[in-house]
């Protein structure tokens, strides 16, 4: 039913760096329900348990993810994490992911005194361990369509980060897109060059932007807690002055992987 989409995706793969050229179609969500042989788990999560809407379903031949959660009305010093998502089966074998995604709605009730949190919709994964064998030390990377309250109205920034043991690298930005813009995002582990490759294609302008995120860790040990995830959600600010919340609605399609 989506052969034309698959063809376009394969043509676009030819322009990717070598680390991501062997991608193959993983799921195009043509059939309900969510395929448990491809998606090992799904989640609705809020770190404080304060959530309302949560959707994880195939609708109109796309994976539909929606989540709304709330901050704590206590002080101005923290945040609450929440999201809806799905985890790839056989995550330890996946080295690259490419998917279409559209953030259709991104609405935040923010906190003026604690404004630096917001949405994160996209991909993340753990790829290797630096040698300790402890899963909390696994090295990973993320690529998200992100928004905080101070960003330009209606805009999402597409950013990548690496992380290890709870420490995150500075953002690597691929630019901005308007909410509602269909895009294709890619995240790949380029082990021979000790870096991650991130990419963004705006499906309206057909402009592709890519960047590398190098690291200095030893990368010969497999991840102790391998995971690859697609999600929609983010962080709400704790706030003394007002109730805060974050609502994100997104659709994913045409997921490709490299092994």
What are these regions (language model features)?
Residues 29, 181-189, 196-198:
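Short tryptophan-centered beta-strand motifs in secreted/extracellular beta-sheet-rich domains
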Residues 159-186:
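Short, aromatic/His-centered strand-loop micro-motif at the edge of beta-sheets
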Residues 1-8:
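Bacterial N-terminal signal peptides that target proteins for export
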Residues 15-17:
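N-terminal signal peptide c-region/cleavage motif recognized by signal peptidases
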Residues 20-21:
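Boundary of Sec targeting at the N-terminus
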Residues 28, 72, 94-96, 215-259:
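Ligand-recognition surfaces built from glycine- and aromatic
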Residues 28-53:
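Short, tryptophan-glycine- and acidic/Ser/Thr-enriched carbohydrate-recognition patches
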Residues 64-157:
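Secretory/extracellular carbohydrate-interaction modules
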């Amino acid at each position: 039913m989506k052969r034309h989409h698959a063809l376009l995706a394969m043509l676009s793969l030819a322009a990717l760096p070598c680390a991501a050229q062997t991608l193959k179609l993983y799921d195009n969500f043509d059939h309900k329900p969510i395929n448990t042989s491809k998606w090992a788990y799904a989640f609705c999560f809020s770190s404080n348990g304060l959530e309302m809407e949560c959707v994880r379903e195939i609708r109109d031949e796309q994976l539909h993810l929606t989540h709304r959660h709330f901050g704590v009305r206590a002080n101005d010093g923290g945040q609450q994490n929440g999201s809806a998502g799905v985890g790839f089966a056989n995550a330890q074998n996946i080295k690259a992911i490419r998917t279409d995604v559209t953030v259709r709605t991104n609405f935040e009730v923010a906190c003026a005194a604690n404004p630096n949190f917001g949405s994160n919709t996209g991909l993340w994964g753990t790829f290797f361990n630096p040698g300790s064998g402890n899963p909390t030390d696994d090295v990973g990377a993320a690529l998200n369509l992100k928004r905080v309250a101070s960003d330009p109205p209606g805009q999402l920034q597409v950013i990548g980060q690496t992380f290890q043991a709870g420490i995150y690298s500075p953002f690597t930005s691929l630019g901005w897109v308007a909410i509602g813009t269909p895009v294709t995002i890619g995240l790949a582990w380029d082990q021979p060059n000790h870096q991650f490759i991130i990419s963004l294609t705006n499906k309206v302008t057909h402009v592709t932007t890519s960047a590398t995120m190098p690291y200095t860790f030893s990368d010969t040990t497999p991840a102790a807690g391998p995971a690859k995830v697609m999600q929609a959600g983010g962080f709400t600010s704790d706030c003394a002055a007002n109730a805060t919340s974050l609502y994100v609605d997104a659709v994913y399609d045409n997921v490709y992987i490299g092994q």
